[in-house]
Design a protein with these regions (language model features):
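Sec-dependent bacterial lipoprotein signal peptides
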Residues: 1-24
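Short, solvent-exposed coil/turn segments at beta-strand boundaries
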Residues: 53-60, 80-92, 107-114, 161-162, ...
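Short solvent-exposed loop/turn micro-motifs enriched in small/polar/acidic residues
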Residues: 76, 98-101, 148-152, 185-188, ...
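N-terminal leader/targeting segments and the immediate start of mature chains
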Residues: 20-84, 157, 230-238
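Hydrophobic lipid-interacting interfaces of membrane-associated proteins
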Residues: 64-70, 97-101, 112-121, 210-214, ...
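Flexible, processing/modification-adjacent segments and terminal tails
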Residues: 117-179, 183
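An acidic-aromatic
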Residues: 84-142
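Gly/Pro-enriched, hydrophobic low-complexity segments
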Residues: 163-238
Length: 238
């Protein structure tokens, strides 16, 4: 067989180029598939979140109970609540049970004044703050207390998903006084914190376990935060 030597350089160059292309492709895939490594520790991330949340003027929140409920003053068993929080108060809508009756209640708190709807008639009236079942509710303090008291913080196994950091830990039940009122003081429920990986704003809190005396061990409270620094203002009911 005759070998044409003038073909060898071309064949060699082609093979070399092909090898480089394959190598670059593999290298690119390796970079893309490399797991994300957090640049801060869980404790640092929680501290950064606390600072970020302190700088907010307002946000929206929602409280749900995949398991259980929260007992408020007046034997009100709250199952769901949501509203807006500003620097001078909040507006909350809640769904609850009184005995076997299902009721909806709305309350507006502006500075030192509180208005609330009658659970049976839906009519608004101004009430003394201490007479409101939401008298202990302070979402701003709640967020600060949870972020300030999270213990044994650790990243979830897949801690960064869709630009979120998920931190697991425990909190003293007394930390939740600003939302549940009466607490089982010695209890230490589990907590999961979902943070935005860029801004460190707190997006979701999942509290699992006993926080109130009436709670079961499988009680789950989920607090979702959103609409950070949206343009909102609180107004008294008309």
């Amino acid at each position: 067989m005759t070998v044409h030597l003038h073909h060898i350089p071309f064949v060699y160059m082609t093979a070399t180029a092909l090898f480089c292309a394959i190598a670059l492709g593999c290298s690119h895939r390796m970079v893309v598939e490399e797991p994300t490594v957090s640049l801060v520790t869980p404790a640092q991330a929680v501290d950064l979140s606390r600072t970020a949340m302190q700088d907010l003027n307002n946000f929206s929140f929602e409280l749900t109970h995949p398991q259980g409920f929260t007992t408020l003053a007046g034997s009100l068993e709250m199952t769901k609540a949501g509203g807006i929080v500003t620097s001078n108060g909040f507006d909350i809508n809640a769904e609850a049970k009184i005995g076997r009756a299902f009721v909806r209640v709305e309350a507006i708190v502006i500075n030192d004044k509180t208005w609330m709807t009658n659970p049976l008639t839906g009519m608004w009236s101004q009430v003394a703050p201490e007479d409101s079942p939401f008298s202990s509710l302070d979402p701003v303090k709640l967020v600060a207390d949870i972020l300030g008291e999270t213990q044994n913080g650790r990243y979830e196994e897949n801690e960064q998903v869709s630009n979120e950091l998920i931190i697991l830990g425990q909190i003293p039940a007394i930390t939740l006084t600003a939302i549940v009122g009466e607490v089982q003081r010695e209890a230490m429920p589990d907590v999961s914190l979902t943070l935005d990986a860029q801004s460190y704003l707190l997006k979701k809190i999942v509290i699992t376990g006993i926080a109130q005396p009436e709670d079961e061990s499988n009680t789950i409270r989920v607090i979702t935060l959103s609409n950070f620094n949206a343009t909102v203002s609180l107004q008294p009911p008309s």
